[in-house]
Amino acid sequence: MLKKNEIVTVEIVDLTHEGAGVAKVDGLVFFVENALPGEVIRMRVLKVNKKIGYGKVEEYLEKSPHRNEELDLAYLRSGIADLGHLAYPEQLKFKAKQVKDSLYKMAGITDMEVPLTLGMDHPVQYRNKAQVPVRRVNGQVETGFFRKNSHDLMPIEDFYIQDPVIDQVVLALRDLIRRFDLKPYDEKEQSGLIRNLVVRRGYHSGEIMVILVTTRPKIFRVDQLIEQLIKHFPAIKSVMQNINDQNTNAIFGKEWRTLYGQDYITDQMLGNDFQISGPAFYQVNTEMAEKLYQTAIDFADLGEEDVVIDAYSGIGTIGLSVAKHVKEVYGVEVIPEAVENSQKNASINGITNAHYVCDTAENAMKNWLKEGIQPTAILVDPPRKGLTESFIKASVQTGASRIAYISCNVATMARDIKLYQELGYELKKVQPVDLFPQTHHVECVSLLVKRS
């Protein structure tokens, strides 16, 4: 049995779905960060139990030709870019394999062709939103990212996958917090004022929203701070404050205040204008979200006689994108602010055939059935936990001929596809889409068609 700190030579034979290298020694499976298939390394044993262990690269004896040697390892250690050490064309293959493997493991599907993941020409600096903790490190106020699996802040100035203008705003805020002597949050002591900085920037519009997440309402000289900030970044249209006084990992608390401008910014997606509020869900990679949604729309093959249900509708991005091409759209979202955004966004774009309710998706589906609404197509874009069994059964009862499923977790998507197949639907096609280059996350669109 290998012991902690022992060093052994191993070959990496696979990658986990989270991008860790896999090695096998004496019947044990070891997970090794920053190691790629085909590499031979000297591995230090960090931790070992009866079946699995964790190791660390001490030395590379043979490196993979697919290794990205230019990656700053801080991005790997923080989890900002946990797949950044793998060359981008190989990342796209890896993500397609994740989809194929999940369909096999969770749904027993072996014959589905999974095309190459749709990728980006410029797979960095794509994120339109930053959520950055503020802490004191070595006596200095810093912004950055937590080291993976910890709450130790690593000061970072260039976030690699974020819009560089957002990085500049974060650094300007950090410098102003230092200058105005505002106290950063101390998690252990439950003290300090500034917990997090959240910055959004419209991909097409360039409009910027800044959110100061604080432990209490009063921010000393906040008007002067905002004045200085806007002097450098006139594209700022909104400065919000969110008050979170709880001992929690959640970014936002319940109370919101508008400190400057309006409580939203505007951006465009697939030809529509969208108002995006502070807490609203909006895909962080606009360029690829447009490809993701267009793929779902194309899969569903929608026409002017179609009645469409848009489940987990967010601020209406996908439902309003299809509304101009179909008869009616019925959307449901559980977050009240997002439903208000959807209704406003429909109005802004002159769309009168899209109707939104605030409810759980399964409740709304049952109510629409009672009202005699009969959808021909359903678009679903659930959170990572996927669909509930009751939602799936309710959606089947509508008799919709096709379901386009947008997933941010291919394991739960495959699980849900299995149930849909048992209830009379057939998986026709899938398409992975890379919304999160340099990370292990993959989005996927699948099309389910009702068996005749």
Placement of each model-derived feature along the sequence:
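Short, solvent-exposed loop/turn elements at beta->coil junctions and helix N-caps
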Residues: 115-123, 187, 196, 432-435
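Short, acidic/hydrophobic/Gly-rich beta-strand patch recurrent on exposed beta strands
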Residues: 21-26, 144-147, 211-213, 342
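Rossmann-like S-adenosyl-L-methionine
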Residues: 2-9, 17, 217, 221-452
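Terminal RNA-binding accessory module
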Residues: 1-74, 355-356
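Carbohydrate-binding surface patches
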Residues: 198-202, 208-218
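Internal alpha/beta scaffold segment
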Residues: 153-195, 216-240
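Extended interfacial segments that mediate partner engagement and assembly in macromolecular machines
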Residues: 58-69, 73-184, 204
